[in-house]
Regions:
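Two-component/phosphorelay signaling modules centered on CheY-like receiver
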Residues: 5, 14-33
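Active-site residues of response regulator receiver
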Residues: 11, 57, 318
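Helix N-cap/capping motif at the beta->alpha junctions
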Residues: 12, 34-43, 65
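Active-site beta3 strand of CheY-like receiver
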Residues: 49-55, 82, 312
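Alpha4 helix (beta4-alpha4-beta5 surface) of REC/receiver domains from two-component response regulators
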Residues: 67-70, 74, 87-108
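EAL-family c-di-GMP phosphodiesterase catalytic domain
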Residues: 87, 109-120, 236-238, 265-273, ...
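C-di-GMP signaling machinery
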Residues: 125-157, 197-201, 242-245, 279, ...
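Bacterial c-di-GMP phosphodiesterase EAL domain
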Residues: 139-256, 270
Length: 406
């Protein structure tokens, strides 16, 4: 992993600070700063600039970790944060959600005492393609005209992250994740331009273009014998379009890809915000044979009754409920309830964000159908997928107790 970025470690315990610094040094980091509480951390950041990664405890005197995160978010004092605590999972989940809602790039939540493997896992996300996808760049001077020009110039590209079965790691599909190769700003994440596209009305043009990209790639894979599905994110702003289902069906037919190989994803929160408005389009898409996936499930407080009204084929459980769940009995109980509920509705379940073997095994043992996360593979260009299939799934088969070729 890269170890050339700066880290600020905040903890009121001298022992924990020394331990954390030792772990960071073992990982190859040299640009390390230490602070004994939130106020000292803010002074350091004011004097020396924002660190690349802030690693902070929560319970501290004077300014605690929660207040520190709020100030860091308001003043944009860190590129990314790691939350560390020995508190129960409910508190950690709330703080994690609060930080993300404030626009912070949360690499992960780690239980104390810090372990080398856990710290390595979260810090690796700072450089990963998936983490790039979560980055927000609110200061960029972008406009709807820029997005339309980018579409016309084919500056938007797709990377693909594998979705595999938890029993053997068999590839079933990929999620198409958009990036913008901007001529001035470089590679931009969706957070940098999707909100603007939605607000300005440019989202439909962008969505149509990305669907064409994904379908063209599916056609190429299928022609070479790789019969997998591809998932494309659908904005809630697009759902009221009366012609959406017909247009997607026409685009699929044009490249001779069967509708069942295209999965359309929409987040739980966006879906439930105006379920009545969405249901007509979703029903028509299902009637035409397309698969529907509810993304980020577990963050929007949907009830079983609400979920049963959606003609979805798949539920993607949010990574905040999956990451670290193997060491968290409360999260395990939540996961089990969601997976069991999804089974009762005769949908497929997919766990997002397993970053280690323990979380991967937990998803398998709880009966989750599929998984998608760093432990499996990071998002990759389309050309890399076949090579990954040859060499990248061995650890999944071993973790599943399988040894032969599958």
């Amino acid at each position: 992993m890269r170890a050339d970025f700066s880290v600020l470690l905040v903890d009121d315990s001298k022992t924990q600070l020394a331990h954390g610094r030792s772990l960071l040094q073992q990982l190859g980091f040299s640009r390390i700063q230490l602070a004994s509480n939130g106020r000292n951390a803010l002074r350091l950041m004011a004097a020396g600039g924002a660190p690349d990664v802030l690693v902070t405890d929560l319970e501290m005197p004077d300014i605690d970790g929660v207040e520190l995160l709020r100030v860091v978010a308001e003043q944009r004092l860190a590129s990314a944060v790691v939350i560390v605590s020995s508190h129960e999972s409910a508190i950690l989940t709330s703080v994690d959600d609060m930080a993300r809602q404030r626009g912070l790039r949360v690499l992960g939540v780690v239980q104390k005492p810090l372990a080398l493997t856990d710290l390595r896992t979260v810090l690796e996300r700072f450089e990963s393609p998936t983490d790039i996808a979560e980055e927000s760049s609110p200061m960029l001077a972008l406009s709807a005209a820029d997005i339309r020009r980018g579409v016309a110039s084919r500056e938007f590209i797709l990377h693909y992250q594998p979705k595999v079965t938890t029993t053997g790691g068999v590839l079933k599909g990929v999620e198409a994740l958009v990036r913008w190769q901007h001529p001035q700003y470089g590679l931009l994440s969706p957070a940098s331009f999707i909100p603007l596209a939605e607000e300005s009305g440019a989202i439909d043009e962008l969505t149509d273009y990305l669907l064409d990209l994904a379908l063209t790639q599916l056609q190429a894979w299928h022609a070479h014998g790789l019969a997998i599905a591809a998932a494309v994110n659908l904005s809630a702003k697009s759902l009221p379009r009366l012609d959406l289902a017909d247009q997607i069906a026409a685009a699929t037919a044009a490249v001779r890809v069967e509708p069942r190989f295209l999965v359309l994803e929409i987040t739980e929160t966006a879906l439930m915000a105006d379920l009545a408005l969405s249901l007509e389009t979703l029903a028509r898409l299902r009637l035409k044979g397309f698969s529907l996936s509810i993304d980020d499930f577990g963050t929007g407080f949907s009830s079983l009754q609400q979920l049963s009204r959606v003609p979805a084929t798949e539920v993607k459980i949010d990574r905040s409920l999956v990451h670290g769940a193997a060491a968290n009995p409360t999260m395990q109980a939540l996961l089990k309830n969601i997976i069991d509920m999804v089974k009762k509705l005769q949908m497929k379940s997919l766990g997002e964000g397993p970053d280690n073997e323990a979380d991967w095994r937990l998803l398998r043992d709880l009966g989750c159908d599929m998984a998608q996360g760093y432990y499996i593979a990071r998002p990759m260009p389309a050309d890399n997928l076949v090579e990954w299939l040859k060499h990248g799934t061995k650890h999944l088969r071993l973790a599943s107790g399988l040894t032969g070729r599958h």
